[in-house]
Amino acid sequence: MLLKVKKHGLKTCRLLPKLPILFSSGVLIFVFIFPNFLWAKVDLVQVVEKLQYPWAMDFLPGSEALVTEKPGRLQKVNLETGKKTEIQNLPEIHAVGQGGLLDVMVHPDFKQNQKIFLTFSAPTNASGDATTTLISARLEGHQLSDQKTLFQADPALPGGHHFGSRVRMAKDGMLYFSVGERGRMKEAQDPQNHLGTVIRLQENGKVPQDNPFLKNRKGRAEIFSYGHRNPQGMALHPKTGKIWVHEHGPQGGDEINILKAGANFGWPKTTFGEQYGGGKIGIGPKSPGIEEPLLHWTPSIAPSGMDFYQGDIFPNWNGDLLVGSLKFRMLVRVDLEGSLVQGQEVVFQDRIGRVRDVRVSPEGKVYLLNDEYRGGIFRLDPL
């Protein structure tokens, strides 16, 4: 069941009496509680099992994929047979709290260059400080070679909170890489550090000449946007080529944003969320000069993983956004017309645990990772 909404209108779902949906200045606002029932007729098939806290996946040529496990393992898996092979020679990883081995991206020209990209929390000293890190490497057989550190966020800090992170390559070959604010919320408003930012780099790690802060020095040269909290979803729009990002709010205020060069996305100056246990954060949800979210969830759903659907298996979903939820253990479809939100659908809930990542294969198959000790990869099939 999909709830359609109109601009400046208010409509309440009959099945969800606590789900008002309204627009204000073109912004979609949600307050909801999800019961335990299915909204879409789909089946879930586990294709790979016995993965420990899988965090991200990307597709290799053929029927294989790479999957990260947060404790620090990278697996090559066969999506048809379920066979797993652990990749060797990984860098040192700080697997503490929310940190560990995080995102993986396979280069679009992998057949020619065997290149992949990994994001993870890396230790920086013996005292336990760590920072969000991006590397490239070549996958030769079942081991990594030619590893190059492309970026490390500054400063490195103790603790295990809010590392981010996702990485995607835009159509022009630029890398976009999200960095959490490590729980130092005020630092996200200071682009002189990397906390709470999205980084933009050439694939060799060099700073593009058109990065927004390269010449004016109002921020670090690597930064593309700032004012983010903990972005754990990133996707490339298949038509516009723009990068979409979602991030965790505090108690409420999870957001989806479309990135803009040099933009301030507000955290913690503006947010629809509040302190855990109650209490205001910042000056409110809006302020001049700060980008408003395309969509936000209040209360939070704890979004993680995101991809645009393109394919023939679910033809009615083409151009829509699929988002995982850790808190409500569900998959959400955001119905889009271009870049305008029309409504949402709960595809399923409470069937595989916490949904950590969502990926759509080149063939239009939808794969999901569950953030569980005995996790795995699941394929979504129509009934």
Task: Please provide the spans of the model-predicted regions.
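Bacterial N-terminal signal peptides
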Residues: 20-36
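Beta-strand initiation motifs
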Residues: 39-43, 81-86, 139-148, 206-219, ...
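Conserved blade-ending motifs and adjacent loop-strand segments that build the rim/top face
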Residues: 342-362
